[in-house]
Design a protein with these regions (language model features):
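Short loop/turn motifs that connect adjacent beta-strands in outer-membrane beta-barrel proteins
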Residues: 40-50, 86-93, 142-149, 239
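Surface-exposed strand-loop-strand hairpins of Gram-negative outer-membrane beta-barrel proteins
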Residues: 58-80, 216-218
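Extracellular/periplasm-exposed beta-strand and loop segments of Gram-negative cell-envelope proteins
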Residues: 64-72, 104-129, 161-173, 177-194
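Predominantly the C-terminal beta-signal and adjacent terminal strand-loop region
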Residues: 183-239
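Sec-dependent signal peptide cleavage junction
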Residues: 20-51
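Residues that define the transmembrane beta-barrel architecture of outer-membrane proteins
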Residues: 46-50, 71-77, 126-132, 148, ...
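Bacterial Sec-dependent N-terminal signal peptides
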Residues: 1-30, 236
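Residues on the lipid-exposed face of transmembrane beta-strands in outer-membrane beta-barrel proteins
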Residues: 79-85, 99, 132-140, 154-158, ...
Length: 239
């Protein structure tokens, strides 16, 4: 099983977890209000809400000499479960548990030094991460009713990069193809931290994240991969 398949399998397992978490929320939301004497506390603009979200983004930050990347094909995707707690009509707090996959495609050009000077047909760094995030939400339409509305999120994310692969692909002189997925890399840091911002309305939002820590140990003096990612998010909940 190659690195991409392993990360996709982990993504699928987390999807099942998130799906059943969402179903548990749905059962509560589908109570017949005419028969229920206790007002619900769960909803987009009620006391609390749980829901699933998906995100997809691109590397947006500047690369460095010696570790140039291919923009457009260097991407990230993620899935998670979000818990939001309303403090006031304009302010909420929350946390998220998620799984992220990141893929940095390395440009093969003279001057490359990360992770070595060898030029290959294709080369990338694959990351599979479990994440936990905490955020502040500021709503811009306090009189919106039970509706998610327009919002700004500011938060921090801790990442445990438990799957990291250096992937190399080449074509041999006889035309056969060889691919190597190298793990147990001695130069990587497995714990990282990001800060992020989201601007959205209802189910859709745009986000940007900025990595605060180094992916590589300082002992190796490698140029860092880009720290900025940007993309969009889809939240799944009943309006």
């Amino acid at each position: 099983m190659n690195s991409g398949t392993k990360i996709s399998a982990a993504f699928f397992v987390f999807f099942l977890f998130a799906y059943f978490e969402s179903e548990a929320q749905t059962v509560i939301l589908s109570v017949d209000r005419g028969k229920d004497s206790i007002p619900s506390q769960r909803g987009p603009n009620l006391k609390k809400i749980s829901h699933v979200f998906f995100n997809f983004g691109f590397v947006a930050g500047a690369d460095k000499p010696g570790a140039r990347i291919k923009y457009g094909s260097s991407v990230e995707y993620g899935i998670g479960v979000r818990k939001k707690y309303k403090i006031s009509p304009v302010y909420s707090i929350g946390w998220e548990l998620g799984f992220d996959g990141k893929f940095f495609h390395l440009d093969q050009q003279d001057g490359k030094i990360f992770p070595d000077t060898t030029l290959n047909d294709a080369e990338r760094m694959d990351y599979g991460s479990t994440t936990i995030s905490f955020f502040n939400r500021f709503n811009l339409d306090p009189n919106r009713g039970n509706f998610m509305g327009t919002f700004l999120d500011l938060g921090v994310k801790g990442c445990w990069d438990w799957q990291i692969y250096h992937v190399i692909k080449n074509t041999l002189p006889d035309g056969s193809k060889v691919s190597s997925d190298i793990s147990a890399l001695p130069y990587v840091n497995h714990l990282n931290c990001e800060m992020f911002a989201r601007v959205g309305r209802s189910h859709l939002s745009l986000y940007a994240s900025y990595r605060l820590t180094n992916l590589f140990k300082s002992l190796y003096a490698f140029p860092e991969l880009p720290v900025l990612m940007a993309g969009f998010e889809l939240a799944i909940f009943r309006q």
